[in-house]
């Protein structure tokens, strides 16, 4: 049976919950068109997160890996285009580490592009009435760290496996502590992630439509 690995993070930065894990854990053992979804939680810690991710990939042997993370302040489901080879932490991770201008992989390439049909995924999610867009940066914190490490592994050892990263907004119960910050319901995020998986599994060549940004 084909399997999809989807990951979410533990809470960080003083939050009580992390929306990525709150939604992703609901998808564990879900069957979609003959494909089994396996959900795993990652620690919000440099190095440790990649160790946990690599262990999960070894265990699950997936055809698709989707890593999900919180992007407080963003209003859309944002599907990441690129990961860069740098850790530059504005705040410490959950183990107190705060790397500055450190490469994720020594001698690794400057960046990796996603292995997902991101524009087709954005279009499909929007057609379901859920705000979505292509993101040009995954940041320089643990989310980018995981995305880069994932793509490095897939490019080096699992070239047939699709993979990438999706950022999601706060849940409403978080946004009440961040006045003015946008949020999205867990149900909407769940629908968006199910669509993302379905489209990623079906589409081999992405749509040739705009998804860029002017800044």
Swiss-Prot record:
GO MF entries: pyroglutamyl-peptidase activity
EC number: 3.4.19.3
This protein's UniProt keywords: Cytoplasm, Hydrolase, Protease, Thiol protease
This protein's record includes keyword Protease: yes
Root EC class: hydrolase
SUPFAM superfamilies: Pyrrolidone carboxyl peptidase (pyroglutamate aminopeptidase) (SSF53182)
Subcellular location(s) of the protein: Cytoplasm
Family matches, as InterPro entries: Peptidase_C15, Peptidase_C15-like, Peptidase_C15-like_sf, PGP-I_bact-type, PGPEP1_Cys_AS, PGPEP1_Glu_AS
Reactions catalysed, as given in the entry: Release of an N-terminal pyroglutamyl group from a polypeptide, the second amino acid generally not being Pro
List of catalytic residues: 80, 143, 167
GO cellular component, one term: cytosol
Keyword Cytoplasm in record: yes
A GO biological-process term: proteolysis
Similarity comment: family membership: Belongs to the peptidase C15 family.
PANTHER family named among the record's database cross-references: PROTEASE FAMILY C15 PYROGLUTAMYL-PEPTIDASE I-RELATED (PTHR23402), PYROGLUTAMYL-PEPTIDASE I (PTHR23402:SF1)
Subunit structure: Homotetramer.
NCBIfam families listed in its UniProt record: PRK13197.1 (NF009676), pyro_pdase (TIGR00504)
Protein known as: Pyrrolidone-carboxylate peptidase
The species this protein was found in: Yersinia pestis
Taxon lineage: Bacteria, Pseudomonadati, Pseudomonadota, Gammaproteobacteria, Enterobacterales
């Amino acid at each position: 049976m084909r399997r999809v690995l989807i990951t979410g993070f533990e809470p960080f930065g003083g939050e009580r919950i992390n929306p990525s894990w709150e939604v992703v854990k609901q998808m564990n053992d879900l069957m979609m068109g003959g494909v089994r979804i396996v959900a795993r939680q990652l620690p919000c810690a440099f190095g440790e997160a990649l160790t946990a991710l690599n262990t999960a990939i070894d265990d699950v042997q997936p055809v698709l890996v989707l890593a999900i993370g919180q992007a407080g302040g963003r209003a859309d489901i944002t599907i990441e285009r690129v990961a860069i080879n740098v850790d530059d932490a504005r705040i410490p991770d959950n183990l107190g580490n705060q790397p500055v201008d450190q490469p994720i992989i020594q001698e690794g390439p400057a960046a990796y592009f996603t292995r997902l049909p991101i524009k087709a995924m954005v279009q499909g999610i929007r057609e379901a009435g859920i705000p979505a867009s292509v993101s040009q940066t995954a940041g320089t914190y643990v989310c980018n760290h995981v995305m880069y490490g994932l793509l490095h592994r897939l490019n080096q050892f699992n070239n047939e496996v699709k993979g990438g990263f999706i950022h999601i907004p706060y849940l409403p119960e978080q946004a009440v502590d961040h006045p003015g910050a946008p949020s999205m319901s867990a149900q909407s995020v769940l629908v968006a992630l199910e669509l993302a998986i379905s489209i990623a599994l079906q589409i081999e060549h992405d749509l040739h439509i705009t998804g860029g940004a002017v800044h």
